[in-house]
């Protein structure tokens, strides 16, 4: 397989001390000031927390690279936009399936983050989202490597997930969190075909199990 090079990395993650805070039993991401990254106030106000987190991380990872040089945006998520999904389903139950606000449903779709990044920079290129739970990022990375193997020069790849109190409670009751700390965050990588002057790392393959 064609070697792939990591040129830039951006991350929004929990604090370094790895201790739950704000009276929450799970690790919550330390979010930046989004006003400096997502400058459109109207757009920013309409975004949910995970969408802002993912879009800001993706834009930071792109840096000063011209949007025309991005041949693809590939995102991955295990559970998607949980807050908006919960909000829409609660409205569905509370209003007995009548007079529903469509915004939470629109914002809860899995491809929202990749689409918003493309819309902000007018990137008319390959755009894909993988939702395979624990294999989501590996699937996105493998897709990016295949696209680069076919001739693409630069691909933006990212993984985003959020944790909510409802999701945490359900996972805990099902025994899914034994021995691990639940958390959330966003991570993006700018991958390229050529090594360039200062690549951060080289990826030679992807192994899943």
Predicted regions, residues:
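Short-chain dehydrogenase/reductase
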Residues: 141
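Conserved "HGTGT" condensation-loop signature of ketosynthase/thiolase-family condensing enzymes
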Residues: 1-138, 146-152, 160-209
């Amino acid at each position: 397989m064609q070697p792939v090079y990591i040129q830039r990395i951006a991350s929004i993650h929990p604090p370094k001390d790895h201790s739950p805070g704000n009276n929450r039993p799970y690790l919550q991401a330390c979010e930046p000031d989004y006003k400096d990254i997502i400058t459109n106030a109207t757009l920013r106000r309409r975004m949910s927390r995970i969408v802002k987190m993912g879009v800001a991380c993706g834009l930071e990872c792109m840096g000063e690279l011209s949007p025309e040089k991005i041949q693809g945006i590939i995102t991955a998520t295990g559970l998607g936009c949980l807050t908006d999904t919960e909000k829409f389903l609660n409205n569905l139950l509370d209003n007995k399936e009548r007079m529903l606000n469509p915004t939470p449903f629109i914002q809860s779709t899995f491809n929202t983050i990749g689409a918003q990044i493309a819309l902000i920079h007018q990137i008319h290129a390959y755009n894909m989202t993988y939702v395979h739970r624990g294999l989501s990022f590996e699937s996105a990375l493998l897709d990016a490597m295949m696209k680069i193997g076919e001739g693409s020069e630069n691909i933006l790849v990212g993984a985003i997930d959020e944790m909510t109190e409802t999701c945490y409670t359900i996972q805990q009751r099902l025994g899914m969190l034994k021995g691990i700390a639940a958390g959330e965050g966003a991570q993006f990588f700018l991958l390229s075909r050529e090594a360039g002057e200062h690549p951060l790392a080289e990826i030679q393959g992807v192994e899943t199990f």
